[in-house]
Amino acid sequence: MRNGVRGIGGLEAERLQACIPLAVDCSRTRLYGCGCSGVSGLLRRMVLSASRGRAIALGNHIFLPDRHDGDLAILAHELTHCGQYQAWGPVRYFARGALEQLRHLFYRKLGLGSNPYHYHAKAGRPFTSYGMEQQAQMVEDSFRSRQQGQVIPSA
């Protein structure tokens, strides 16, 4: 760990990767959480301010607000975005991400369209056919409900 920035590895990575139906190279990810200092801390504060205090993944960099420290379901959601970034590349990832956030803004502020995080899981429908935020929300929900035996569709 350097200046509060750390990688995701060991048992944590195994547990998270087990619930994400996308390939994610955790060794390429960096987590900016509680305890970030120096330039990393400044970067974390700026990103979290711009995201209105919401957890966010920018490429392979995950920024978590203090209230989500230790919340593996939120981390699984954001790690899903890292997997999307790794699979799609930066142009497609950031273009789709910007579009999803605009859709969410229109839905939240104006009541237009549908919530890009909301999904209806259908048997036989592949995981990759869902939207960017739907995929991440499915992983988060699945992680939270694993004790009840619910699973998400395979890739």
Where are these predicted regions, by residue range?
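Metalloprotease/metallohydrolase-associated module, dominated by Zn2+-dependent proteases
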Residues: 5-34, 38-45, 50-53, 93-155
